Amino acid sequence: MFLRQEDFAAVVRATPLISLDFIVENGQGEILLGQRLNRPAQGYWFVPGGRVCKDETLEAAFARLTQAELGVRLPLAAGTFYGVWQHFYDDNFSGEDFSTHYIVLGFRLRVAESDLRLPDAQHGSYRWLTPEQLLASDNVHENSRAYFSPDAPAVGL
C-alpha cells in the first residue's frame, strides 16, 4: 500500500521504515551503484533498494523492488541475506524538517549486466565499482560503503 505524501510524511516523522538494499555484483566482482536523485542521500552513489510497503510480504517486496530498481523481477531466493543494517539521515524525502530512520535488510545478488534494465526514476546514472574503489570514494554514501567495511558490520542477531 502506497500512502499519500502527507500520510507518508507522518509515518517517516514518527517511525522507522523497513527497506531492502541490493548489493548487486557483476561477473568481474564490481558492485552496482546509482546516483540518487531524491532525498535522503540525494546526489550520493548508493546501492539500489527501497522500502517495504504495509501488508507486503518480503517475497513480494523483493520482486517489486528488483523490478523497479534493476529492471528485472527476481524472486527472494535469488538473493543471499546479508544482515540487518541501520541507516539514519538528517533529512527526509520532502525536506530537512525531520529525519529518516531505516531498518535495512541487505541482500547480495549476482546478476549478469546484460539482464539489467536500469531505470532512471530513482537514480540519474549508474556505475560499477570494485569494493576497494567504493570504499575509497567520498561520493559513495557511508551507508553503502558500510556493506564493505570491516568497521561497520551488520547488526548482530
Swiss-Prot record:
Cofactor: Mg(2+)
Keywords linked to the UniProt accession: Hydrolase, Magnesium, Metal-binding
UniProt entry tagged with the keyword Metal-binding: yes
Enzymatic reactions: GDP-alpha-D-mannose + H2O = D-mannose + GDP + H(+)
Binding annotation for substrate: 2-3, 8, 36
Short sequence motif named Nudix box, residue ranges: 50-71
Manner of cofactor binding, per the entry note: Binds 1 Mg(2+) ion per subunit.
InterPro entries linked to this entry: GDPMH, GDPMH_Gmm, NUDIX_hydrolase-like_dom_sf, NUDIX_hydrolase_CS, NUDIX_hydrolase_dom
GO molecular function: GDP-mannose mannosyl hydrolase activity; magnesium ion binding; manganese ion binding
Domain Nudix hydrolase: 3-153
Record has Metal-binding as a keyword: yes
SUPFAM superfamilies assigned to the protein according to its UniProt record, in alphabetical order: Nudix (SSF55811)
Binding positions (Mg(2+)): 49, 69, 122
Annotated EC: 3.6.1.-
Subunit structure, as described in the record: Homodimer.
Physiological role: Hydrolyzes GDP-mannose.
Protein family according to the UniProt entry: Belongs to the Nudix hydrolase family.
Protein name: GDP-mannose mannosyl hydrolase
Gene: gmm
